[in-house]
């Protein structure tokens, strides 16, 4: 595949990065490649006999083939459903790039493609010292932007794309994820997004809240 690893970010929190990331994993696997997900930092985790686990990270693990060890897929699992900087401080954890780089290297050794899902929107910091751009640079990844299609999405998408470029990073594609079934003129909005975003569209995920990731993969258009 043209891009053996990439970082999935979004126009905001709650716009469907995990939906898109799991669909991407299944789309890559449908092409005959092995693919694993990674959630470097996750907040809002729940206690399990195996430790703190996050719903989104578990979804990535389930969509992966082979399925990696949870601690490798999600090195920083934070209990509080807060911004990572606050959630980490609550439990006395100091986020560092080194464990994330080591975990990523392990995942790269396990599969042909690694889909790395970020936190919140692009400008959401990882810690007082680290932005997501720092992590993406350290892992040397291109970026895929998930646009939550709702009122205001054109503004959010253009601002996010501009911020990624300003950070000196490459956005290789965007995905339209329909999150508001009541949105008016949705076709026009998606058309306008396509006209204003310089990178190619990797797909349009329809509003299907109970759909399985494997079914949504048919709406992904991976580059050759």
Curated annotation (Swiss-Prot):
One GO MF term: magnesium ion binding
Subunit organization: Homodimer.
Superkingdom: Bacteria
Binding site for substrate: 43
UniProt key word Metal-binding: yes
Protein name (Swiss-Prot/TrEMBL): ATP-dependent dethiobiotin synthetase BioD
Name of the coding gene: bioD
NCBIfam families membership: bioD (TIGR00347)
Catalytic activity line of the entry: (7R,8S)-7,8-diammoniononanoate + CO2 + ATP = (4R,5S)-dethiobiotin + ADP + phosphate + 3 H(+)
Classification of source organism: Bacteria, Pseudomonadati, Pseudomonadota, Gammaproteobacteria, Lysobacterales
